[in-house]
């Protein structure tokens, strides 16, 4: 249930499920765009849904990726511009986890003016648990919001490898 952080990896379990589903429903064409933070199109790719997606990824890496030459003892991260609520602010945490040494600390800053999660109120309850407890909830059928559960499981996994501090 807990896999390594898939951020920036085109071959991750979620992507595999999407590609499998796309093949089942016979998607014939995908128009994939790489955009700026102001939603301006930089480049567009069209064609087979997997190939157009992968081409877009390769271009997006040149625009949005930052090379990391080593892992930090402490990483300070901002969620900007995804900071309306903590649900969105996690993008900063996931990026920081990739840049931080095992056991190293993460300090995330995010304003979250709308709180933790407007659309997934149960998520705040899930966030208090470790991965073992969350997995027990799943096997016992106690999970109502599977999207919130999955994200809480990812956060728990990061917290088990890094002390995390949030300033909001």
Regions found by a protein language model. Give the residues of each.
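Short, glycine/acidic-rich beta->alpha junctions
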Residues: 13, 87-92
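Short acidic, glycine/serine/threonine-rich loops at helix termini
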Residues: 41-47, 87-88, 118-122
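Structural motif
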Residues: 73-78, 107
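Short, glycine-rich nucleotide/cofactor-binding loops
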Residues: 79-89
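C-terminal non-catalytic interaction/assembly regions of soluble proteins
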Residues: 90-168
């Amino acid at each position: 249930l807990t896999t390594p952080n898939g951020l920036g990896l085109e071959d991750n379990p979620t992507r595999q499920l999407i590609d499998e589903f796309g093949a089942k429903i016979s998607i014939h064409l995908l128009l994939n765009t790489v955009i700026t933070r102001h939603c301006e199109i930089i480049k567009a790719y069209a064609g087979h849904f997997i190939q157009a997606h992968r081409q877009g990824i390769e271009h997006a890496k040149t625009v949005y990726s930052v090379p990391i030459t080593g892992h930090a003892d402490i990483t300070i991260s901002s969620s900007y511009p995804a900071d309306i609520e903590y649900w969105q602010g996690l993008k900063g945490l996931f990026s920081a986890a990739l840049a931080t040494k095992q056991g190293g600390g993460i300090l995330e800053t995010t304003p979250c003016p709308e709180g933790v999660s407007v659309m997934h109120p149960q998520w705040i309850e899930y966030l208090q648990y470790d991965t073992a407890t969350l997995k027990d909830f799943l096997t016992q059928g106690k999970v109502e919001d599977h999207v919130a559960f999955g994200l809480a499981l990812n956060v728990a996994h990061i917290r088990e490898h890094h002390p995390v501090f949030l300033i909001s």
